[in-house]
Amino acid sequence: MSGEDEQQEQTIAEDLVVTKYKMGGDIANRVLRSLVEASSSGVSVLSLCEKGDAMIMEETGKIFKKEKEMKKGIAFPTSISVNNCVCHFSPLKSDQDYILKEGDLVKIDLGVHVDGFIANVAHTFVIGVAQGTQVTGRKADVIKAAHLCAEAALRLVKPGNQNTQVTEAWNKVAHSFNCTPIEGMLSHQLKQHVIDGEKTIIQNPTDQQKKDHEKAEFEVHEVYAVDVLVSSGEGKAKDAGQRTTIYKRDPSKQYGLKMKTSRAFFSEVERRFDAMPFTLRAFEDEKKARMGVVECAKHELLQPFNVLYEKEGEFVAQFKFTVLLMPNGPMRITSGPFEPDLYKSEMEVQDAELKALLQSSASRKTQKKKKKKASKTVENATSGETLEENGAGD
């Protein structure tokens, strides 16, 4: 990113920026729905990850065609983490694949950007739920808990509120279902070309993290990727030795790479992905990419997104949405096709204050402002109602 870009930060105070976010959100929602529909027993996770990434590239290739210099595409590679796998499972062709089976709890996580404006989304569902039946037991508990955490956050991430209010609500919601938010996971503010902005919301912090984590107030015209990860177990995510395949460049780090393979790999990263997360799958020669990444990661030019696991036998559910803090209320631009009636838990939120919050409306005040001409592709993401009402649930 050039110095000029840094001086003139573009925000959602500009209509065109809002349109770019919505277009990215619309693509993210459509790709997600397509992957959910394609997920069934016997389907390979690798094939779904490849399909998701290919669709994002294809769909972003259809917009702003005249703007030859504009970067657009994947803001987070398609990851599909099953059951006790917490996040970032996105295998290479040379890795062991995972084949989906009946009853698997599946989390799909992906991101799209248009001109560096990022729309992230994640969704959880269970494979092969027969019509007329419901998911029960711990899978239902953890999915309900995570979904209600996301719904609480949609109502709490608004100007004037603090990030700590969201953290507290998440703990209360999860505990009502005898579940635990994954310890130390962060939701980030988003800025142009930046997926990990400085303001964050932490989940289930340790005592040390509570001391270290910056308190922050949400402000109008900010954007957040709100990421909820809840476990049926203790909420501790560990690296189990699975190969990391997703990385992002850290623009603040510099180092003179010694190996020719590393240098060639890193210059391709800079050219193609800038500071967006990418997968080693995106390289033509996967073997060279696997070699090139080692020196880059060792010297912290690249940050890894490690594949994390909860204990065997536990379940982890994830819901992530991107929200624009508009002057007339929060606008959620991404969301999955959640069907609440499929999940039956014996537990529910007991806390009266939280119950009232969850029952309150999350739709925005309508403005009598003349609509700017937005692209056809974003019409169904522009109403600003919660997306369940305008197509995210169909």
UniProtKB/Swiss-Prot annotation:
Ranges where the record places region Interaction with RNA: 361-375
PTM-bearing positions, type Phosphothreonine: 366, 386
Location of Phosphoserine modifications: 2, 335, 361
UniProt GO molecular function: nucleic acid binding; RNA binding; transcription corepressor activity; ubiquitin protein ligase binding
Residues found modified as N-acetylserine: 2
Pfam families, sorted: Peptidase_M24
GO BP terms: negative regulation of apoptotic process; negative regulation of DNA-templated transcription; positive regulation of cell differentiation; regulation of translation; rRNA processing
Induction summary: By mitogens.
Annotated tissue distribution: Widely expressed.
Modification comment: Phosphorylated on serine and threonine residues. Phosphorylation is enhanced by HRG treatment. Basal phosphorylation is PKC-dependent and HRG-induced phosphorylation is predominantly PKC-independent. Phosphorylation at Ser-361 by PKC/PRKCD regulates its nucleolar localization.
Cross-link (Glycyl lysine isopeptide (Lys-Gly) (interchain with G-Cter in SUMO2)): 298
GO cellular component: cytoplasm; nucleolus; nucleus; ribonucleoprotein complex
Region RNA-binding, residue ranges: 46-54
Chain residue ranges for the region called Disordered: 358-394
Family: Belongs to the peptidase M24 family.
Subunit structure: Isoform 2 interacts with the cytoplasmic domain of non-phosphorylated ERBB3; the interaction requires PKC activity. Interacts with AR. Treatment with HRG leads to dissociation from ERBB3 and increases association with AR. Interacts with nucleolin/NCL. Component of a ribonucleoprotein complex containing at least PA2G4, NCL, TOP1, PABPC2, RPLP0, acetylated histone H1 (HIST1H1A or H1F1), histone H1 2/4, RPL4, RPL8, RPL15, RPL18, RPL18A, RPL21, RPL11, RPL12, RPL28, RPL27, RPLP2 and RPL24. Interacts with HDAC2. Interacts with RB1; the interaction is enhanced upon PA2G4 dephosphorylation.
Function text: May play a role in a ERBB3-regulated signal transduction pathway. Seems be involved in growth regulation. Acts a corepressor of the androgen receptor (AR) and is regulated by the ERBB3 ligand neuregulin-1/heregulin (HRG). Inhibits transcription of some E2F1-regulated promoters, probably by recruiting histone acetylase (HAT) activity. Binds RNA. Associates with 28S, 18S and 5.8S mature rRNAs, several rRNA precursors and probably U3 small nucleolar RNA. May be involved in regulation of intermediate and late steps of rRNA processing. May be involved in ribosome assembly.
Name by which UniProt lists this protein: Proliferation-associated protein 2G4
Organism: Mus musculus (Mouse)
Gene: Pa2g4
